[in-house]
């Protein structure tokens, strides 16, 4: 779990997301409150419930990007799901309890990686010994093994093929499939590899010819897992999920039953009803054991273009007490998105063209023109926020991207006149599109 202060979390989000200070503050405080609760002792710690968040804002203003960056910051089990993927219990499709099962899988993966890092040195030695056995045989003299070990560590044997027995190779290619609507202990998914593992010798494995370079990763995984207690990993992961798990529920506005609209749209409100106990706190059965959701933090977000937050069930609104509105982006915001963010679109474009030997530079007035065109098209057609910049920039760079392999060594300067010339047709099409039914 992260120990960053709210100010540090906001500062980290500022590197990638322009504006939206209220939303950043809300998620930073919520994340810090996870740490604060861990410092409490006794019954009070159990009583402190997370304050779930509802983020409201137009598409392309940074809601989903906040969740992506938060996932990297959280250092805790984090799951981002779209509310539209789920259906009411009893209908074909995934029920909302699958959210918790998926979160547990994420938690186990995190905990396993953490434990593997703690035994990395021992696993490295064991993997190296197995590769040496495959190269020179287990009966080789110590001098021979030392000689080959030096060459192995120097990378001289990376391309040499060896025959190794890797666990699970017999069933590695077998898929998982879901059983729609299968509730409770069956967990809705069957892994054919697990089912047929013993029958096909999946645990024993079978000899495979593989290069030394490619053998390192699977051997490290195998040797690490031999040193780990899987039951302990599962118990610790479930505890981590229950105490520090975070679920980001995107597109929550799409499951609103819109006012005055009836008909066969039964699963929308049903999904909301199914979410109620999950967000309030319930126990979900997973294949690893029961998981309590009382202290899992839920962050819901939606554009609410067609529906309104008040169209959500009142009970669901009550379970999302912190409401944050994200502002639409302005010309200045677009300009900052293009220039200030850590991996801005302009930096990406320049780096991509540099791989072809073409040096692309954007003048300040070109950046202003790109921002202005994006805002104009958003206002005249459909406001899709910062995503519009990708459309505009691709149109501007279209000719350069196509001819880049033939223009290696050139320096291309893009100014406002070039931008206007390239996007003129885009603006005209936007104007015409208003009159087409």
UniProtKB/Swiss-Prot annotation:
Parts of the chain that traverse the membrane: none
GO cellular component: HslUV protease complex
BP GO terms, sorted: protein unfolding; proteolysis involved in protein catabolic process
Positions that bind ATP: 18, 60-65, 250, 315, 387
Assembly notes: A double ring-shaped homohexamer of HslV is capped on each side by a ring-shaped HslU homohexamer. The assembly of the HslU/HslV complex is dependent on binding of ATP.
Function: ATPase subunit of a proteasome-like degradation complex; this subunit has chaperone activity. The binding of ATP and its subsequent hydrolysis by HslU are essential for unfolding of protein substrates subsequently hydrolyzed by HslV. HslU recognizes the N-terminal part of its protein substrates and unfolds these before they are guided to HslV for hydrolysis.
Family from the record: Belongs to the ClpX chaperone family. HslU subfamily.
Protein name per its UniProtKB record: ATP-dependent protease ATPase subunit HslU
Native source species: Methylobacterium nodulans (strain LMG 21967 / CNCM I-2342 / ORS 2060)
């Amino acid at each position: 779990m992260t120990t960053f202060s709210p100010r540090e979390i906001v500062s980290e989000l500022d590197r990638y997301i322009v504006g939206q200070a209220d939303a950043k503050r809300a998620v930073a405080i919520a994340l810090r409150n996870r740490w604060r609760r861990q410092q409490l002792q006794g019954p009070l710690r159990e009583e402190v419930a997370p304050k779930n968040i509802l983020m409201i804002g137009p598409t392309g203003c940074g809601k989903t990007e906040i969740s992506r960056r938060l996932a990297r910051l959280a250092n805790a089990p984090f799951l981002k799901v779209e509310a539209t993927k789920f259906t009411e219990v009893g209908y074909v499709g995934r029920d909302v309890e699958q959210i918790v099962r998926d979160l547990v899988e994420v938690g186990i993966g995190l905990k396993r990686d953490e434990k593997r890092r703690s035994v990395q040195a021992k696993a490295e030695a064991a993997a190296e010994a197995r590769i040496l056995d495959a190269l020179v045989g287990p009966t080789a003299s110590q001098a021979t093994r030392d000689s080959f070990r030096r060459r192995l560590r120097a990378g001289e044997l990376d391309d040499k093929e060896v025959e190794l027995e890797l666990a699970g190779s017999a069933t590695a290619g077998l898929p998982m499939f879901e059983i729609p609507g299968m509730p409770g202990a069956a967990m809705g998914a069957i892994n054919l590899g697990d089912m047929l593992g013993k029958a096909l010798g999946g645990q024993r494995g079978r000899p495979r010819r593989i290069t030394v370079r490619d053998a390192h990763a699977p051997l490290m995984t195998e040797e690490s897992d031999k040193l780990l207690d899987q039951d302990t990993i599962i118990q610790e992961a479930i505890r981590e999920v229950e105490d520090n798990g975070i679920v980001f529920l995107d597109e929550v506005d799409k499951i609103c039953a819109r006012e005055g609209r009836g008909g066969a749209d039964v699963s929308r409100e049903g999904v909301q009803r199914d979410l109620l106990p999950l967000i309030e706190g319930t126990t979900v059965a997973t294949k690893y054991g029961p998981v309590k959701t009382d202290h899992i933090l839920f962050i819901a977000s939606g554009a609410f273009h067609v529906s309104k937050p008040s169209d959500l069930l009142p009970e669901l609104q009550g379970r999302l007490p912190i409401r944050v509105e994200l502002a639409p982006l302005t010309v200045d915001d677009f300009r900052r998105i293009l220039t200030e963010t850590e991996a801005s679109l302009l930096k990406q474009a320049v780096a991509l063209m540099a791989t072809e030997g073409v040096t692309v530079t954007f003048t300040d007035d070109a950046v202003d023109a790109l921002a202005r065109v994006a805002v104009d098209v958003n206002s005249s057609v459909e406001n899709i926020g910062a995503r519009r910049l990708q459309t505009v920039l691709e149109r501007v760079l279209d000719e350069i991207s196509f001819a880049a392999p033939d223009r290696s060594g050139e320096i291309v300067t893009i100014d406002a006149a070039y931008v206007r010339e390239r996007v003129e047709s885009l603006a005209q099409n936007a104007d015409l599109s208003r009159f087409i039914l």
